[in-house]
Amino acid sequence: MTPVKPALLSANRVHVAFPGLHGAPDARAVDGVDLGIRRGEIVALVGESGCGKTTLARALLGLVAPTGGGVVFDGRPLEYSGRSLKAYRKRVQLVLQDPSGSLNPRHTVYDAVAEGLRIHGHRGDEQAAVAEALSRAGLRPPERFFLRHPHELSGGQRQRVVIAGALVLEPELLVADEPVASLDASVRGEILALLLRLRDELALSALVVTHDLGLAWNIADRVAVMYLGRIVETGPVEQVLTAPRHPYTRALLSVLPEAPGDPVVLTGEPPDPSRVPPGCRFHARCPILAGGEAERAGVAEACRTRDPGILTGDDTVQVACHWAAAR
């Protein structure tokens, strides 16, 4: 049996809460998350807008300090002092969803990619490093792009420049927040193929944050489904997406164009993160509970009153659902 590699980056019971206004309770944006990403692995973090996935990504990047729990990178707890954080951010790079907003319209492609090198005091051949990063990102020959400005590039080329700006520092892990959301469908596949190639060639790890389970299917090794600040289902992507166990995962999958049957329409909106309901945090919108299936399984009361707990974030398929556990 092949031993499981230790996580390169892991969240350990991470909480991120924001103070409420005018004495209101704190908003629990991330409410106890365990998540691990190994070397050479792509993990998709999936959920609706407002579920806490971007806040979790910011905590993993060191952009916001957890209010509970912690982040471990390469076996060492993440420190939030200036020097330690600067060294960490060289090894873990962010790729944003909107390349137009990420790139200064006045800067050339060369300057945009070289910016990270200058911030981190790179002492080698800057031009060679920029050329190598652009080439790895699929902009060849790289010298053709040095003096271009963002408005002279297509959307896909701009996203490749953003990726090159991350690659130039030779990171070990990318955090990509909706990396293809702003791109035309014809270009999305090219960027996803690029991320897969970088994983294979460089053993580069990635956390891909997305609302799109279809994207997760195409790129990820593992998937973590997030709802109201918690991971509610996680595991190898093929197992989770072909045989989803949590009602929320099932609902997200049901609206994909290729999904069989009728889409599951969830009623209402996710609860306010400052007023997380007792029991399963999904129970107020759960079609299994509303349809009587949880009652027939003898778990309806548990759904309403008992927290399913925090998933451990390991390689196995895990689900935070009383009904799924009873089946």
Regions found by a protein language model. Give the residues of each.
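ABC transporter nucleotide-binding domains
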Residues: 1-242, 325-327
